[in-house]
Regions:
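Active-site HxH/HxHxD metal-binding segment of metal-dependent hydrolases
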Residues: 5-99
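Histidine-centered divalent metal-coordination motifs
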Residues: 30-36, 111, 170, 232
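Short hydrophobic beta-strand that contains or immediately precedes a catalytic carboxylate
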Residues: 1-2
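C-terminal regulatory/interaction regions
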Residues: 194-257
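Metallo-beta-lactamase
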Residues: 5-7, 68, 87, 95, ...
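Aromatic/hydrophobic pocket-lining residues that form the small-molecule binding cavity
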Residues: 37, 150, 154, 229
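Alpha-helical elements of Rossmann-like donor-binding domains used by nucleotide-donor carbohydrate transfer enzymes
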Residues: 13-16, 42, 149, 156, ...
Length: 257
């Protein structure tokens, strides 16, 4: 699952971990960011294993994001593996298996439109990739990231009782996944309230809002924080809780309604 970045030493480590009586038969990709998917093609050359994923890097975008991308510059595109494409396209609810194991594919767009989690059946284990991480909440940067989808996917994962141990793409294993998911939901709702409060009396853009509400982070992280804020603002716009100046893009000025 997720061979990682195109680094030769990393490839060698993967191949070295395969014992003489083992074979890599499938390459499963959770999503196509450059720290997860670029090594897949090189690993395939070594193993002849097919690559499984939801789709290319632009698959799974919501109708809203597709329309906004056509109308204006949303910026974004951080860390996207733009050349990625799978051999086998995986749909939500598909099962990927051989004689020894079976994975449930769970489509969880939000961090990226083509994001999948993989649940190893009868093990209690879910590979949650970057949707539920072990050390921080995920970056959601439009148009690749979509906060409406992200929140919906969190609610979706809460309904799965079979998986009580998550292995994320970053950070330690998570042995209390529902508690962590509920924390992420609560945290995002807290940010939403902060955003609405910050523009209740004055109109601001995403960066200005980030500077007001992310007071406890290093200033070098404000650009990333502003992308999260922008994702919230698009979600709030869809819910008719904010209005914006001119065409909706990253430079738009927002006011609460």
């Amino acid at each position: 699952i997720d061979p990682g970045p195109n680094i030769k030493a990393h490839l060698n480590s993967i191949l070295a971990s395969v014992s003489l009586n083992q074979t890599i038969t499938h390459i499963l990709i959770t999503h196509s960011h450059i720290d997860h998917s670029p090594l897949a093609k090189i690993l395939q050359e070594k193993t002849n294993a097919p690559i499984y994923a939801f789709g290319d890097s632009f698959s799974g975008r919501s109708k809203m994001m597709v329309e906004l991308t056509k109308k204006g510059d949303l910026k974004g595109g951080e860390g996207l593996d733009k050349d990625f494409s799978p051999d086998v396209y995986v749909k939500d609810g598909d099962q990927i298996s051989n004689d020894e194991w079976c994975f449930d594919a769970i489509w969880t767009p939000g961090h990226l439109g083509n994001h999948l989690c993989y649940g190893l059946k009868k093990s209690g284990v879910l590979f949650s990739a970057d949707h539920v991480m072990g050390w921080a909440t995920s970056l959601v940067s439009p148009p690749d990231g979509d906060l409406t989808q992200f929140m919906d996917s969190l609610q979706k994962l809460l309904k799965f009782d079979d998986y009580n141990l998550y292995y994320p793409g970053h950070g330690d294993k998570i042995d209390n996944p529902k508690e962590i998911i509920n924390y992420i939901i609560k945290h995002r709702k807290m940010r939403e309230k902060q955003i609405l409060k910050s523009i209740a009396e004055i109109s601001l853009n995403s960066t200005q809002i980030a500077e007001k509400i992310y007071i406890d982070v290093n200033k070098s992280l404000i650009p990333a924080a502003a992308r999260n804020v922008f994702a919230h603002l698009i979600d709030l716009k869809q819910r008719q809780l904010v209005t914006n100046s001119h065409e909706l893009n990253f430079e738009s000025i927002f006011s609460s309604i």
